Amino acid sequence: MRFDKVIGQEEAKMRLRQLVDEERIPHALMFTGPTGSGKMSLALAFASFLLGERWDGKSTLNSDAAIANAEAMLAKWQHPDLHFSYPTIKPKGAGSDTKVTSDDYAKEWRQMLMGDTYFSLEQWMTLMGAEKQ
């Protein structure tokens, strides 16, 4: 996800760039806002840049080969240093002792991200099949 794909959010992009330029990136950032505000897209674009994708011709990586490799992994949201945690549901018919983790829905999560990064919780729940329960 590149920053040029993020709609609006110019001030937020500027502040994120400032954090990078000043080498003052905190250990955690929370991207919040109403549905449709682009918080997911902005967070994904920033994570992609931190993991090597180019932003205005710059990258956190030093070689073209490393950048190309990182960009290929990020295009499928499968970079080894990119981790997601998201709401899950217990599969229909699962026992009470069944432990559900985000990894159980990784394929569906990547499918959602590949389609459009502007989605709602309701759309995510539908993709997981929550409306059938």
Q: Where do the protein language model's features map onto the residues?
A:
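Clamp-loader machinery-focused feature within the broader ASCE/P-loop NTPase space
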Residues: 2-133
